[in-house]
Amino acid sequence: MPTLTDSPPTTVLTVTELQQLLPHRYPFLLVDRIIDYVPEKYAVGLKNVTINEPFFQGHFPGRPIMPGVLIVEALAQVGGVVLMQMNWAKDKLSVFAGIDKVRFRRPVVPGDQLILRAELLVVKQQRIGKMQGRAEVNGQLVCEGEMMFSLVD
């Protein structure tokens, strides 16, 4: 995954292109762009975390920390990019079916740049599946876990 010592990340998909793939919109679109993508395998997204995020108003005043559930949601949105580019999934909605083995390793605060990787592990009957998610800031692990999804018509 890219770190600060690497050259600036390239853009594979812009936020406008993301909005064509995902149903999420402000304030719940939690990915700014996709910086790496291998069809039907994985995607890597980027989220610039700013003090202007609406969730910082209450989480926590005077000590803003990005809620862990929103880090997991951002990972799931990157996973949605992988799914929504598969021909059989294009007209479906991907929803959470569960999460397993999720661990949070350090807080995410304003000014951080989240690098979010979602790797497709398995799909069954073109309906349900599992992804591995990993989020980093400056090369340090922030969050990791498995995400299960279901595709609905």
Swiss-Prot record:
Tell me if Phosphoprotein is a UniProt keyword of this record: no
Recorded superkingdom: Bacteria
Keyword tags:
Cytoplasm, Lipid A biosynthesis, Lipid biosynthesis, Lipid metabolism, Lyase
One GO BP on record is: lipid A biosynthetic process
Task: Please give the Gene Ontology molecular function terms for this protein.
Answer: (3R)-hydroxyacyl-[acyl-carrier-protein] dehydratase activity
Instruction: Give the positions the UniProt entry annotates as the active site.
Output: H59
Query: E.C. number, please?
Result: 4.2.1.59
Q: Where in the cell is it found?
A: Cytoplasm
Q: Under the cellular component aspect of Gene Ontology, which terms does the record hold?
A: cytoplasm; membrane
Which InterPro entries does the UniProt entry name for this protein? FabA_FabZ, FabZ, HotDog_dom_sf
Which reaction does this chain catalyze?
a (3R)-hydroxyacyl-[ACP] = a (2E)-enoyl-[ACP] + H2O
Main function: Involved in unsaturated fatty acids biosynthesis. Catalyzes the dehydration of short chain beta-hydroxyacyl-ACPs and long chain saturated and unsaturated beta-hydroxyacyl-ACPs.
The record's annotation in PANTHER family points to: 3-HYDROXYACYL-[ACYL-CARRIER-PROTEIN] DEHYDRATASE
Q: Which HAMAP family match?
A: FabZ (MF_00406)
Q: Which NCBIfam families match?
A: fabZ, PRK00006.1
Q: Please state which protein family the record places this protein in.
A: Belongs to the thioester dehydratase family. FabZ subfamily.
Q: What is this protein called?
A: 3-hydroxyacyl-[acyl-carrier-protein] dehydratase FabZ
Q: Which organism is it from?
A: Thermosynechococcus vestitus (strain NIES-2133 / IAM M-273 / BP-1)
Write the lineage as a comma-separated list. Bacteria, Bacillati, Cyanobacteriota, Cyanophyceae, Acaryochloridales
